[in-house]
């Protein structure tokens, strides 16, 4: 099994080493019920407009698994989790190399750690 693990690391390493893109979330730590949560993800080490990538928002409620919120393409095309669609807006600002999440009418059920991802 050690040999297999080592082999898998070798195969995966080149793509990992070449991937210099970093994403950093920013926004308020707390939002009151009924308010709108606004988060921004800043992309560094590469252009948000280059490559065939979808830029996503994901969240993880305490003690639960990951929940996909939605994604956006640099052109502005979006797709949202149907269960959140009525409250979610994801937008992109290519001039700032950022994409953003707005989640309206938050409740205790929206308590989670929010992540941006490519």
UniProtKB/Swiss-Prot annotation:
Q: Where is the signal peptide?
A: 1-19
Location in the cell: Secreted; Cell membrane
Tell me the GO BP annotations in alphabetical order: immunoglobulin mediated immune response
Keyword vocabulary terms for this entry: Adaptive immunity, Cell membrane, Disulfide bond, Immunity, Immunoglobulin, Immunoglobulin domain, Membrane, Secreted, Signal
Annotated region (Complementarity-determining-1) at 45-54
Segments for region (Framework-2): 55-71
Q: Does the keyword ATP-binding apply?
A: no
Q: Where is this region: Complementarity-determining-3?
A: 117-118
Region called Framework-3, residue ranges: 79-116
Framework-1: where is this region?
Answer: 20-44
Q: Mainly resides where?
A: secreted
Q: Which GO terms describe its cellular component?
A: extracellular region; immunoglobulin complex; plasma membrane
PROSITE patterns linked to this entry = IG_LIKE
What is this protein's function? V region of the variable domain of immunoglobulin heavy chains that participates in the antigen recognition. Immunoglobulins, also known as antibodies, are membrane-bound or secreted glycoproteins produced by B lymphocytes. In the recognition phase of humoral immunity, the membrane-bound immunoglobulins serve as receptors which, upon binding of a specific antigen, trigger the clonal expansion and differentiation of B lymphocytes into immunoglobulins-secreting plasma cells.
Subunit relationships: Immunoglobulins are composed of two identical heavy chains and two identical light chains; disulfide-linked.
Name of the featured protein = Immunoglobulin heavy variable 4-30-4
Q: Which organism is it from?
A: Homo sapiens
């Amino acid at each position: 099994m050690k040999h297999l693990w080592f082999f898998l690391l070798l195969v995966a390493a080149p793509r990992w080493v070449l991937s210099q893109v970093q994403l950093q979330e920013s926004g308020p730590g707390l939002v009151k019920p009924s308010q709108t949560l606004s988060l921004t993800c800043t992309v560094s080490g590469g252009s948000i407009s280059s490559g065939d990538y979808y830029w996503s928002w994901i969240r993880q409620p305490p003690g639960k698994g990951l929940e996909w919120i939605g994604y956006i393409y640099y052109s502005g095309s979006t797709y949202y989790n149907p269960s959140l669609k009525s409250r979610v807006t994801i937008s992109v600002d290519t001039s700032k190399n950022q994409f953003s999440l707005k989640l309206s009418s938050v409740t205790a059920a929206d308590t989670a750690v929010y992540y941006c991802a490519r």
